[in-house]
């Protein structure tokens, strides 16, 4: 937190072969505040600007960042982190343990959308200027994995700018401005238009990129984004529309990079609401409180048809809240419900809805790949068994407030576990919402099961891999039996880039400028 001279900042040499790099995506990051909004567009973007104690490498493994090393504390009390010396924030101030303690207090505060990350944490204490101890409520063997996206802010800069706590609703100085330790710094921010970044000359790590200026532009119209890539107006777009991928890939000047994301797309329900809120049956008792109705939804949605016609074979069917590539995926529960309209109708009749019912389906139209088209298909499929959905699709900046205000009967959600572990969605999506315990913060529908709640701390504390997997298998089976959510598919990755660009495609869909090279 001590300030350095400008001359000291200029010691780092600029990368050789430097160029300007422009890229586009469908969603503009909602904020520059790393603790305000827990969403991939925000966290992915800000991982270029801010850093955590640990980070993910090219192979997605955890590696040192602002902490040079770490070790478990005695008796499983927590973890001790030894901080990197000589690190500076982009304004020249020095990073130390005070910034870590402050960033914990800020990111775990009730005002922060990331506070659920710290549910297993009881305290963070400074040992000395470059050592911190993070105390956990129980032994937590995967804790370092869980903080890869926890970004450290400069305590003095944040407080002096009046942004001591995040404010995702009204915004503050940190909403439009940033001061991280990462490889790039924000030099211009026009929400919804452009965000410009330049290399942080005082960055502590070895520079691998060749970028001297990077410019991000949100482009929601897919045809416009493709045209910008093909014309060379931008060097990279994410995503390439599925229907255009083959055509784009035929062009010699561009390349389509394909992969499978860690994100599962699913349908969620208003478990807690006593009545329906939308459609002709608004005010009537809520059918989704009955597991048979939720099972009917699972049998009514023709996932193979969605994969074939909308996702063009690029996605994979999902059976759980995590994909098969994630640690803790339950092999015994890998089978998803069959498409069976007759079974869906029978389940509805058994639940007392032989003629079906009307309700509302909320959906984003610029957050996930083909999200609105998927919701339109779901509406048609549900109608065939008597469930008449009123679709309300909207931009993501309007979508999250609607979900947090409980303005839905059913909704579409995508989830990518930040830890790449099956414990993650149990903590965020399946545990009973508990603001004080910082659990269930994305469980918008209020699903609640005492067994799941009791299993979570045992899963978090279990050191034996086999015992832990057995508990995760039990949790996956219970969530399937309850049909807490209806997993649909694992979302594909389709990035388009000019052929002279090399980069790393991460399965969490985070785009890292520090690996971009333009020849």
Predicted segments with their positions:
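Ligand-site clamp/hinge motif
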Residues: 201-247, 291, 379, 388-390
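Alpha-helical secondary-structure segments
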Residues: 22, 96-103, 129-131, 135, ...
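Extracytoplasmic/peripheral linker and loop segments enriched in polar/acidic and small residues
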Residues: 286, 291-295, 299, 307-308, ...
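Acidic-aromatic pocket-rim loops
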Residues: 37, 260-279, 398-460, 507, ...
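Structural transition elements
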Residues: 316-350, 367-371
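Gly/Pro-rich hinge or "lid" segments in bacterial periplasmic/extracellular proteins
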Residues: 149-209, 213-215, 341-342, 346
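Surface-exposed binding/hinge segments that line
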Residues: 116-163
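N-terminal lobe/hinge region of extracytoplasmic solute-binding protein
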Residues: 24-74, 105, 179-183
